[in-house]
């Protein structure tokens, strides 16, 4: 935008066809839209009156969210979001929830214990659900769209606590939440091949083609839950040679595994039927060693995390001593698509020390910023 008289520019926008105006604004980075609302009352009215986008814009890649939790003083909690279009970190309001059992997915934060609740990411407004049949901490969680185009939430795995201890014998049932009926449905737990009591510290998941895939880092077992029949597939093994740990993602129409293989961080595309894998990218060495301390022990890479969606895969270190350095890989389209890596800027100072970091990536819509009260579980989510 130019530095001309804002009233003239507003008048110019008003003379445009409404569809053209909306198309232009939908393609702007959200931080730019927020700044433009300060130009004049006309601009603010124009931008805040935009209808919700029916689906994520191709020019709106997923943001990376980091929620730092301090276990003795919520005053030290901090929240950040990285917008790849503007290449900037934004400070967010810290979570107002009293629970530190947070999970993030699909533009929402969720508390899973002692009561289940959810809130839009950008402007906290917590809402409780009906009681969960089997409360749990650290479950796998995502929102999916049903064949009737409604949205539901699925909980898989996690740990239950009895007297502060984990019940290692219990295999928690899958639970599916219907936000319209405010009700939970019980389904079969993870296949018996997966150890009981596992959570997102050992399991990783991805929503892909109407199936919820779960991968176990210890056994390298993988299985998928059909979101139509509510049944589990046969358990298969997924282990590229030399793999030490990995994270499952759904990116660019592919099932993507990202993890450490020896002393390199690789990305593989996964064929969902056979679980055959093919390498699509390797992180440049200078970026990889910029994420860890060179004088660490052999497990120095263990604090690396990976989260991907759309055409981006984020890799970051959730060790507070490193202040959460990160990089991002853009996955090219097509069979011969070129993947490009770049470093993510440092978090804005000051950055506190946290006992727990909740991290995930998600698209962000105009509704999330200007009309969070209208945000709904599953809005603009495509399974």
UniProtKB/Swiss-Prot annotation:
Coiled-coil ranges per UniProt: none
Q: Which UniProt keywords apply?
A: Kelch repeat, Repeat
- Where are the annotated Kelch repeats, by residue? 63-109, 158-205, 253-308
Q: Which residues form the F-box domain?
A: 10-66
One Pfam entry name: F-box
Please give the InterPro entries that the UniProt record associates with this protein: F-box-like_dom_sf, F-box_dom, Kelch-typ_b-propeller
Which cysteine pairs are joined by S-S bonds?
A: none
On whether Repeat is a keyword of this UniProt record, the answer is yes
Instruction: Determine if Repeat is one of this entry's keywords.
Output: yes
Q: From what superkingdom does this record's organism come? A: Eukaryota
Tell me which GO cellular component terms the UniProt record holds.
cytoplasm
* Protein name per its UniProtKB record: F-box/kelch-repeat protein At3g24760
Q: Which organism is it from?
A: Arabidopsis thaliana (Mouse-ear cress)
